[in-house]
Amino acid sequence: MTGIKIATIGGGSSYTPELIEGFIKRYDELPVREIWLVDIEAGKEKLEIVGNLAKRMVKKSGLPIEVHLTLDRREALKDADFVTTQLRVGLLEARAKDEAIPLKYDVIGQETNGPGGLFKALRTIPVILDICKDMEELCPNAWLINFANPAGMVTEAVLRYTNIQRVVGLCNVPIGIRMGLARLLEVDASRVHVDFAGLNHMVYGLDVYLDGVSVMDRVLELVTDPEKQITMENIAALNWEPDFIRGLRAIPCPYHRYYYKTREMLEEEKEASVEKGTRAEVVKQLENDLFELYKDPNLDIKPPQLEKRGGAYYSDAACSLITSIYNNKGDIQPVNTRNNGTIASLPHDSAVEVNCIITKEGPKPIAVGDLPVPVRGLVQQIKSFERTTIEAAVTGDYHKALLAMTINPLLPSDKVAKQILDEMLEAHKEYLPQFFKKVEK
């Protein structure tokens, strides 16, 4: 590879400036020649705004990178070396429904967990598989770097249902946890290593090392301190019960609050929706503010306000991964990849989120073995939910969708699961043609 071509699907995303910043910072290691930002007709205006900011950022850098804006996905994919996906099918309006409808039934309404995660997968997976068909024809040797949520399910769907096996799923949660732990330990993050294992948005830190020495006991005490909670912009920092964390002997990710503190998180969500609206509505206002900033012809850097969007560290994760693949670095990064026995208690062809050695051949997972008993059951239950959801997304099988909804631990009963499923299917009908091509219930 000389002079890299990158195609970013969902290029009109508010996250794009962070990605551009990452490529500029790493140019010496990652000589990007072309960046193609792709979007759909509905995202045309945002693509223009964010694309022009990207061009100004590149111009300021003085680097010989060409930024192209297009609505023609196939043009962008032709001969690409890396394809990044950061799309949102149905935009924030769909997310708002994912969050609001379950709340009516006293069920968590969240973007990637419970009913919301199920429906985001149902909408997103067919679109990603369609992109992969184009990749098989136009850039069969490209790497697909996916950060479209739910990243784990999307990655697994690609692995199981397409010929694109050079796929890696990315999330900013593990890097956010490592940075958070470094802050608690008051050290530079480069000195901190976390043994990550689990699934996307269901990942645990099984051990924490400082300069190669385990500091797990110290960290377990730090993360139970009410003043030192690790969370994200989009998740309430409800305090963990100290004795629970000591018993778990693992660092939960912020999303685990939905499973271990379901009642409290539900109450918090309901209160927040009354005061501020759903998270989607909050994000929509943040995005409107960001795009107003992006329009400024004098702006030629990523604005710091982007971190409020909840996307901190995405650029670091994505650009570090691409740089390591390109340079065959052999460093360790947590990513979503094929299990292949890495976690003994999960199917081999499933996607898991684990530490991997990153090479030019892609991620080489570091063996985990069996997950500890206290975390194993929940991870297995979520994996059953994920696999059933993927099958529903691919086939449009109503019964599989209902089964997935019902076995998710955030649902109280099969009856409520069916009520939510039916209402959400109708609400998202235009993005779920696979369920409406035939009448069957």
Describe these PLM feature segments.
Residues 87-90:
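Conserved NAD(P)H cofactor-binding loop of Rossmann-fold oxidoreductase domains
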Residues 93-161:
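Rossmann-fold NAD(P)-binding glycine/threonine-rich loop
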Residues 17, 143-212:
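Rossmann-fold dinucleotide-binding core
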Residues 5-31, 35-38:
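N-terminal Rossmann-like dinucleotide-binding module
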Residues 66-79:
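Short acidic low-complexity segments
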Residues 78, 84-85, 146:
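Redox-cofactor binding/interface segments in oxidoreductases and associated redox assembly factors
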Residues 186-441:
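Long, compositionally biased stretches enriched for glycine and/or charged residues
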Residues 25-62:
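Glycine-rich phosphate-binding loop and adjoining beta1-alpha1-beta2 segment
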